[in-house]
């Protein structure tokens, strides 16, 4: 029973709720190293900034309720993290997010707050601009 609950929790974190996670999100383009490390490439990125003076462990990012990235390392205090959108993988397969084919419509962030509570913030986007947060 617990395993089933955790599976639902992992697949649909926005349905669970919790206090807000103090992290800012931006969408844009950034220069990232190529896979072989031989050069750099301008690509679509998601930029996350920890707005607090404490690290956020158990940090995960989800795009469009389908593409997930779970970060092993905590998001450090005041850290600015820039990630290529193509590194996000489908929760049910190994397919990668394609920002050319699909626009980012929602970003859901989860992580552990200093109180031990699980923080959740969801950002809704339209044409790359935040239109709502909850």
What are the residue ranges of the model-derived segments?
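Hydrophobic membrane-insertion alpha-helices, especially the h-region
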Residues: 1-9
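Terminal connector regions
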Residues: 11-18, 89-134
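Short extracytoplasmic/periplasmic juxtamembrane "stem" segments immediately C-terminal to an N-terminal membrane anchor
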Residues: 20-38
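Short, surface-exposed loop/turn motifs at beta-strand boundaries within globular domains
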Residues: 39-41, 54, 66-68, 102
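Structural beta-strand segments of beta-rich domains
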Residues: 42-46
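Asparagine-centered strand-capping/turn motif at beta-strand->loop junctions
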Residues: 47-53
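Short, hydrophobic/aromatic beta-strand segments
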Residues: 54-62
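Intrinsically disordered, low-complexity Pro/Gly/Ser/Thr-rich segments with frequent PxxP/GP/PP motifs
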Residues: 65-100
